[in-house]
């Protein structure tokens, strides 16, 4: 599910109402829609210092709805690096396991802005909600439904195919990721 982070996203806006309605309907039958994933251009969470950073107004307006409707993953771009959060709501972290999350209480946010343009350097602040950050290599991600109760995201180095980050979310139990993540060169 996606709306524009570039246009009116206030609660009164038509796109907010559409998003709310779509998420409510999907939540009524999680058997048919086991995973709720949203996508926006601008990130709610970004620790880059030289890019645009977190879109606080957008986060304040939209994040409560995403948490209320049990959204699992939020995907964004805009800043030219890769970053993954822990499950987070209003900068409060809910689980800090680096790769496996069982029934998280808040969405995991992915910033995947590594498609080919110049990359933004990382932040020296390393916020508590940031689980993994990459700013030295272009890359891409694959989101894989392992089964109706497990979903896995893997971020790959575009040059050599190395796994740079991987995590799994489970509803009943957590399937162990098949790959071992390569430590980030950013620490």
Where are these regions (language model features)?
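Metal-dependent phosphoester/phosphodiester hydrolase catalytic core
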Residues: 1-123, 130-137, 142-181
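Short, solvent-exposed mixed-charge patches
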Residues: 186-187
